[in-house]
Amino acid sequence: MRKSYRVKTERDFQKVFKEGQSMANRGFVVYTLPKENQKHFRVGISVGKKVGHTAVARNRLKRFIRATLTELKPEIRPDLDFLVIARPYARDFDMGRTKKNLIHVLRLAKVLSSEETEIEEK
């Protein structure tokens, strides 16, 4: 995912935290903030040290989240900034469980424009 699709600055992160709405499941919390006049969505990903004690574990989960979001890119509403925060429960997720849980919470948060997202089991 290109840099233009990322929430980068601390100021932008804090704005989404403070002014946005949150939705959660056991694995992830998603904060959303509608933004008008935006060409495409922007996403921030946070995986704290409580989730994985090593950088390898945290980066692996971030890769899974980014891969899922890249796959869902056509279905994500373009008028949003949103943050995906991993919870400690997501520590041992493989790609399939990450995708399933992330799609679930994105549906709850109304980030996906269509309700008919297919979950492919591999």
Swiss-Prot record:
The question of whether Oxidoreductase is a record keyword is answered with: no
Top-level taxon:
Bacteria
UniProt keywords (A-Z) are: Endonuclease, Hydrolase, Nuclease, RNA-binding, tRNA processing
Could you give a GO molecular-function term held by this entry? 3'-tRNA processing endoribonuclease activity
* GO BP annotations listed: tRNA 5'-leader removal
Enzyme Commission designation: 3.1.26.5
User: What is the protein's known function?
Assistant: RNaseP catalyzes the removal of the 5'-leader sequence from pre-tRNA to produce the mature 5'-terminus. It can also cleave other RNA substrates such as 4.5S RNA. The protein component plays an auxiliary but essential role in vivo by binding to the 5'-leader sequence and broadening the substrate specificity of the ribozyme.
Would you identify the family this protein belongs to, as annotated? Belongs to the RnpA family.
Indicate the quaternary assembly: Consists of a catalytic RNA component (M1 or rnpB) and a protein subunit.
The protein here is known as Ribonuclease P protein component
Organism from which the protein derives: Lactobacillus johnsonii (strain CNCM I-12250 / La1 / NCC 533)
**Gene assigned in the entry:** rnpA
